[in-house]
Curated annotation (Swiss-Prot):
<protein>
    <recommendedName>
        <fullName>Uncharacterized protein L208</fullName>
    </recommendedName>
</protein>
<dbReference type="GO" id="GO:0044423">
    <property type="term" value="C:virion component"/>
</dbReference>
<keyword id="KW-0946">Virion</keyword>
Amino acid sequence: MIFCEKCRYSFNITKDVKSVQVGGKVNIALNNLFGKFNKNQQIVESDLTKLKVTDVLYDERFENMTKKDKKKMMSLIKSVNKSFFQEVGGQGELNTNKAYFICKYCKNYRPIEAGTTIYTKNYDTTDNSDIENYSFYIHDHTLQRTKNYICKNKDCKTHQNDNLKEAVLAKNSADQLVYVCTACTTHWINSI
């Protein structure tokens, strides 16, 4: 898990980083543009002079519009100024396929470096590096037990005396069934 450098909360992953300003200066030209659009009034060149493409595209009102209304607004703007949306091509952040770590708490973000591992899961169950000590499991009476087994240890006492036969059933980290002989503490994975 990767944490924010500023507030130490965990990062989320997004492809959509927007510099939405909370409070502060109000863009009157933007309010006029959306007001005229909502009232079906004619948009003129002077309505667009103090606006940037990102002002329109990243505005919450534009984002909440239906696709039909977005296309309608964009075509109305293009009918007044054909080069208004051509600025988008020069904006690197708008047309990229970048992903970002973003903190939902403090709004800090940073691009995800190429080659960064986001999530991994190992499904390899052939790994025989057994680091768990199963000998203590024989003392846990909450685990299931069976007498129907043959111990893998050739020198185990259960091969001579069937009354000593008892094995504890447990699961390993790969969710495989592990038998532990209570007589000799030998453990093995059941192969059916």
